[in-house]
Amino acid sequence: MVLKLFLSKRPIFLHPHCVSSSCRNSDTTIRLSRRIATMSENKSPLLERARNIVPHLETHRHKGQAGRIGIVGGSLEYTGAPYFAAISALKVGADLVHVFCLQAAAQVIKSYSPELIVHPLLDSNDATMQIEPWLERLHVLVIGPGLGRDRLILQTVSELIKICRQLQKPLVIDADGLFLITHDISLVKDYYGVILTPNAIEFCRLFGNDRDRIMQTLEKLGRGVTVIEKGLNDRIYDSLTLEKYECPQGGSGRRCGGQGDLLAGALATFYFWALECKQEISPAVVACFAASYLTKNCNTYAFKAKGRSMTCTDMIEQIHNVFDDIFEHKKE
């Protein structure tokens, strides 16, 4: 049963820094572009909370405060996915993004963008030992874009997830990272702070086809695992409260490759912001809603400009416009 969201009369407890500088007042009026009139009419309290987590751009802030994100993925065959995730995290507003990939993918990913910090370590003999020191510096890790399914690489990633659990590191697991989880669910069981981002096929692999038993299966994962099921209407499942939220419909009929990578990268940035700016609704839920809403509108904007020829690169180019229309702080 989908829960209808409502504004709680209880006070919302915010992080002290958010109250003073990072979060806007709840009564701030946001004027949205007419290009998204249909979606802008949505009055979901989750959208308001998503706006509230966006930090103000202030001169006293230093590099890294808006987010240091890690992407684990990138193989010989798949170099685009980690790039899409990484550049999306940056364009949403993260300060630094590190990509941990196979050696064969490193030069290609570096050539896509000089803004990315690329580490060709995943297939090295001592991969976990070399990557572990970097993990402590990162705020959120995205595991899976372009990872591939090589057995030895998946074993390395399994070890990295175990290290992240010890560090209590927030994770976003996507694509081939979900393939790994499907075969070893214990990696995320009772791991507070994990977000899974399956599409329809990946969702069935994880939870089966019986939708009436989704919450029971989710409960078995343990408290603290959040799932966003990507589809016509993205659905967010919160295992902490066993509640389900539905994101508004949006986008276009064009489903280009890489859209899920855009969402994963954007989600990582939003997730860090939400964790820094605590609200009464789960930070993971708020971040999932924000990433879904942004991605669907990027699709809408890009399709209006490019139509059937639209690609993920066109969607990424629209992140600025969508963010400015929906999430950005406006001066009165």
Swiss-Prot record:
It catalyses: (6S)-NADHX + ATP = ADP + phosphate + NADH + H(+); (6S)-NADPHX + ATP = ADP + phosphate + NADPH + H(+). (6S)-NADPHX binds at G146, N199, A200, I201, E202, F203, C204, R205, D261. SUPFAM superfamilies: Ribokinase-like (SSF53613). Its EC number is 4.2.1.93. Catalyzes the dehydration of the S-form of NAD(P)HX at the expense of ATP, which is converted to ADP. Together with NAD(P)HX epimerase, which catalyzes the epimerization of the S- and R-forms, the enzyme allows the repair of both epimers of NAD(P)HX, a damaged form of NAD(P)H that is a result of enzymatic or heat-dependent hydration. Residues 46-326 form the YjeF C-terminal domain. It holds the Pfam family Carb_kinase. Coiled coil: none annotated. One of its GO terms (molecular function) is ATP-dependent NAD(P)H-hydrate dehydratase activity. ATP binds at residues 230-234, 251-260. CDD domains: YXKO-related. Keywords: ATP-binding, Lyase, NAD, NADP, Nucleotide-binding, Phosphoprotein. It comes from Aedes aegypti (Yellowfever mosquito). NCBIfam families: yjeF_cterm (TIGR00196). Its cofactor is Mg(2+). The keyword Transmembrane does not apply. The keyword Ubl conjugation does not apply. This is ATP-dependent (S)-NAD(P)H-hydrate dehydratase. It is an enzyme of class 4 (lyase). InterPro entries: CARKD (IPR000631), Ribokinase-like (IPR029056). Belongs to the NnrD/CARKD family. One of its GO terms (biological process) is metabolite repair.
